[in-house]
Design a protein with these regions (language model features):
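Short, charged recognition helix plus adjacent turn
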Residues: 1-8, 73-101
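A short, Lys/Arg-rich alpha-helix, primarily the initiator
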Residues: 1-24
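DNA major-groove recognition helix of helix-turn-helix
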Residues: 46-47, 64, 75
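The alpha-helix within a helix-turn-helix
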Residues: 21, 33, 61
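DNA major-groove recognition helix of helix-turn-helix/homeodomain DNA-binding modules
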Residues: 55-71
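Short alpha-helical DNA-recognition segment
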Residues: 25-45
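Short coil turns linking two alpha-helices in DNA-binding domains
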Residues: 39-42, 53, 67
Length: 101
C-alpha cells in the first residue's frame, strides 16, 4: 500500500468487514454486533469507513478467525483495484502526463 489515502483504506476496510460479516451469514450489522459483544454504533461506523482502534481491529480479526495481515492483504487488493479503476476512468491526456513524469 504505497502512497495510500487513509480515508480510502478505511473505506476499503469497512467494505471488507461488511463482506466478512455477510459471509458469516449475518445480514444485519446490528445482529452481528450484538452476537459478538460489539458496540452497535461503533461497528456501524467501522463498516462505513470511520476510524477503528487496534484493540477493536484485533477483536474483529479473532471473530473472523483471520490474522491482521490477512485482513490487510484483502484491503490492499481492494485498494489496488480501486486505483486501477480510477486510472481507467481518467482522460487519456491525464494518463500521458503521468507517464511523462
Amino acid at each position: 500500500m504505497n502512497n495510500t489515502n487513509p480515508q480510502s483504506v478505511l473505506i476499503n476496510l469497512g467494505s471488507t468487514l461488511r463482506q466478512l460479516r455477510m459471509r458469516k451469514g449475518f445480514k444485519s450489522a446490528e445482529v452481528f454486533s450484538y452476537e459478538n459483544d460489539l458496540n452497535r454504533t461503533a461497528y456501524w461506523r467501522w463498516e462505513n469507513g470511520q476510524n477503528i482502534t487496534m484493540k477493536n481491529l484485533l477483536k474483529l480479526c479473532n471473530i473472523h478467525k483471520i490474522s491482521p495481515k490477512e485482513l490487510f492483504e484483502i484491503v490492499d487488493k481492494k485498494y489496488s483495484l480501486e486505483s486501477k479503476i480510477g486510472l481507467m476512468n481518467e482522460p487519456e491526456s491525464v494518463l500521458i502526463k503521468k507517464k511523462a513524469k
